[in-house]
Amino acid sequence: MVQPAATPVSLPSPTVHRSEHTVTVAAPPEALYALVADVTRWPAVFEPTVHVRHLAREGRTERFEIWAEVNGEIAHWRSRRVLDPVRRYVSFRQEHSRPPVTSMSGGWLFRPLADGRTEIVLRHRFTVADDDPAAVARIEEALDRNSARELGALAALAETGHPVDELVFSFTDTLPLQGAARDAYTFVERAERWAELLPHVAQCGADRAGTGLEQWLEMDTVTADGSTHTTRSARICRAPEWIAYNEQRTPRLVSGHSGEWTFAQTPEGPVATARHTVAVDPSGITEVLGPDATLADARAYLRDALGRNSLATLRHAAEAAQRA
């Protein structure tokens, strides 16, 4: 006797949770849209973001990997975004979410208001495994905290009254290596030894987290005038090719600083490169550089100070590679 086919069991659809965060900013929507649309600047502008690496770009669509601080840990996921400069809208969707999140999407909207102001609306939609209430609460808490930090940083930068391109700048220094690039990478990765080996580092502690490929780095740096300042950084290490970092605690003249150390084999031989992206804090210019200093002076000062220290690190890394 033929048994009747079993009736398929339909599983309930996961609950879609929504959040919305807004802020009103004294800046035009075009400038704010441009800041959000350029994801390469995010690590220096948006404090939770540690590093971004593009996977693909085609027209108004882009895919990238992103590392960000979430609930005190460094999370990693892949996202797809669609940019709409006419509507001033940026939509996003995570391609691979981090458990317990099973999906995450949303968008940035920039609404022009009177007197040149803009309302920024940041929306999220997400689902979690098994609709776990505790997981939902954790995700909502993380979204509340990180959205407030992102919107606050965006407002602070845009409301300085200076063009973004005068506040946020990047530069790169490259050094040829006589030894293997892998050995130079190892020197930079093992930052806990820097205080013994680098003259501009007074103290440095490194705590590894998660898989051991992420680090929290706290460092006291000696400046040219002999004073010291303390920075705290999140680092992503991918041996033997690159180390990316984002400063969570910055010196007075800097509102954001991210960077990347890369180690590569070129047709001319192995090289090591240090790249910096810096957001200047205009409110610190007079205190640090004097009453007559300008934004251009601040950029030049930071280019010299940061470049000098990272080149010193690269030279010691090159020497270590040559000895290995």
From Swiss-Prot:
Transmembrane segments: none annotated. Pfam families: Polyketide_cyc2 (PF10604). Keywords: Antibiotic biosynthesis. InterPro entries: Polyketide_cyclase/dehydratase, START-like_dom_sf. Residues 1-21 are annotated as: Disordered. Coiled coil: none annotated. Gene3D superfamilies: 3.30.530.20. The keyword Transferase does not apply. Pathway: Antibiotic biosynthesis; granaticin biosynthesis. It comes from the Bacteria. SUPFAM superfamilies: Bet v1-like. One of its GO terms (biological process) is antibiotic biosynthetic process. Is needed for correct cyclization of the oligoketide leading to isochromanequinone formation. This is Granaticin polyketide synthase bifunctional cyclase/dehydratase.
